[in-house]
Amino acid sequence: MANAAASHVAEQDDVHNGAVFHPATVVFSPALAMAQAMGASGKALLTASVAGYEVGIRVGEFLGRSHYKVFHTTGTAGTIAAAAAVGHLLGLNPTQ
C-alpha cells in the first residue's frame, strides 16, 4: 500500500495517449512489493515492469477511447498490467 501511495503522491502521472492509460502507478507498485518480498534483482524488477507496461498498453489500446468514456482505463487495464508484472516476477507463463 505504501508503494501505491508513493507512486501517486505528486500527481505527476505518466500517460500513454493511445491507451489512455497511466502505467507506472499500477505496474511499479505491485512489482516493487513483490520484488522486495522475493529478494529479486533490479534487473528482474525492470523486466517485469516492462512486461506490465507492454500488456497494459496493449490492453488499453484494444479497449480504445470509447472505453474511457465509461471506465478509467488505468483501473481496468491496470489490473491486468499489474498481474502481468507480478506474474513475470513469479515466473508464471501466459497461461497461468
Predicted segments, located by residue:
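N-terminal core-entry segment
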Residues: 1-96
